[in-house]
Design a protein with these regions (language model features):
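A recurrent flexible, glycine/aromatic-enriched loop bordering the glycosyltransferase active site
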Residues: 154-177, 239, 243
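A conserved acidic beta->alpha catalytic loop
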Residues: 42-50, 94-95
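Short, acidic, metal-binding catalytic loop of nucleotide-sugar glycosyltransferases
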Residues: 25-35
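Glycine-rich, basic loop-to-helix element that forms the pyrophosphate-binding segment
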Residues: 65-82, 92, 104
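Non-catalytic, C-terminal membrane-associated alpha-helical segments of glycosyltransferases
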Residues: 234, 248-332
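N-proximal low-complexity "stem/linker" segments adjacent to membrane-targeting elements
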Residues: 1-26
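Short aromatic/hydrophobic "clamp" motif used to bind/position activated sugar donors
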Residues: 87
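Conserved donor NDP-sugar-binding/catalytic core segment of glycosyltransferases
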Residues: 95, 99-139
């Protein structure tokens, strides 16, 4: 009789390539005091992703047609197939930093049945832009003061957008959810931000959310300028439609935010003496910041744009339609 696992590690894939091979190697090598299983759901890989999975007899592989993939839908399928109390969610390019990643994540959620989900820290790949590395450090350091949260002030939750954002931030690039809660509150079937919508649902239902600083994955992207605009467009368009947030409310906000971000980056470059070692990154930082904010400005007004232009500006939509990189799989 098979041993029932405590955790299922769920990895959606499409054309994961060499980095996925390394991710899977690190996942199956996790050291835990309890059994776990690995479930890969592939949506039409044309590279060697399937062969990589078959190197590991213990890995469960399930395939679906590419047109059936959806960020929320595919994760719901995987969780429904899990045999475990907890489901760990990572992506094909999120590399566990060490062999204690999974145990650290579960240790943060298991003791309190009111905790519905926990997310872990991201750090950048060694080849990442230094400003990406710094921004990830700042972003996740902000959660050190919010290790376990729940909605303890409904009035503040209603009026304070920043408080709401802290409570519903979640990243299923690196997370564990409690399956019994998912059975009541599954993922939404959406193209973007399915993890944050789910976190909003569990917070509003009275559950807690946790942050596991020691459960670390290496995960970052090196975007070209237009890719940065597209990614930011997707973020702002989704946040306007799903949460009502306007990430860049006016041209003046664009200019003032650009100036603030650029001053921050140049100050960091001076402190870290990057001009001599990362000259291109330093020179490109103001342009990258502008494209990010331009994407936020356009995305917040996405419903006013013609459909063809909206599709052109959406990186996620083009990847899902097979018009961009990453083998047509929408990235996270």
């Amino acid at each position: 009789m098979d041993t029932v696992p405590k955790v299922t590690v769920l990895i959606p894939t499409k054309n994961g390539g060499a980095i996925f091979a390394k991710v899977l190697e690190h996942v199956v090598a996790q050291h835990t005091p309890w059994p776990f299983e690995v479930l890969v759901i592939d949506s039409g890989s044309s590279d060697n992703t399937i062969d990589i999975c078959r190197r590991y007899p213990e890995v469960r592989l399930h395939t679906i047609p590419s047109n059936e993939f959806g960020h929320g839908r595919t994760r719901n399928l995987g969780v429904s197939m899990a045999r475990s109390e907890f489901v760990a969610l990572i992506t094909q390019d999120a590399l566990p930093l060490n062999e204690h990643w999974l145990a650290a994540m579960v240790a943060a959620i298991e003791p309190d049945p009111a905790i519905a989900g926990v997310f872990g820290r991201h750090i950048a790949y060694p080849d990442a832009n230094p400003f990406t590395t710094h921004e990830l450090e700042l972003h996740f350091a902000g959660f050190d003061a919010w290790q376990v949260v729940q909605m303890d002030d409904p009035e503040r939750y209603t009026r304070d957008q920043g408080y709401r954002q802290v409570l519903h931030f979640f990243s299923d690039n690196n997370a564990v959810i409690r399956r019994s809660v998912w059975e009541k509150l599954p993922y939404p079937d959406v193209d973007f931000a399915e993890d944050q919508i789910w976190a909003q649902k569990i917070i509003e239902a009275g559950y807690k959310k946790a942050y596991a600083r020691d459960a670390v994955v290496v995960h970052s992207h090196n975007y070209e300028l237009f890719e940065r605009l597209q990614r930011s467009f997707d973020e702002a368009y989704a946040f306007r439609r799903l949460f009502g947030y306007v990430l860049c409310p006016s041209p003046w906000a664009l200019v003032s935010s650009w100036a603030a971000l650029t001053r921050r980056d140049l100050a960091y470059a001076r402190r870290s003496r990057l001009l001599g070692t990362q000259t291109k990154a330093v020179l490109m930082a103001p342009f990258d910041n502008f494209m990010r904010l331009a994407g936020h400005y356009l995305g917040a007004r996405g419903d006013r744009l013609p459909g063809r232009l909206r599709q052109r500006l959406s990186r996620d939509k083009r990847l899902m339609l097979g018009l961009g990189a990453a083998g047509g799989k929408a990235e996270k």
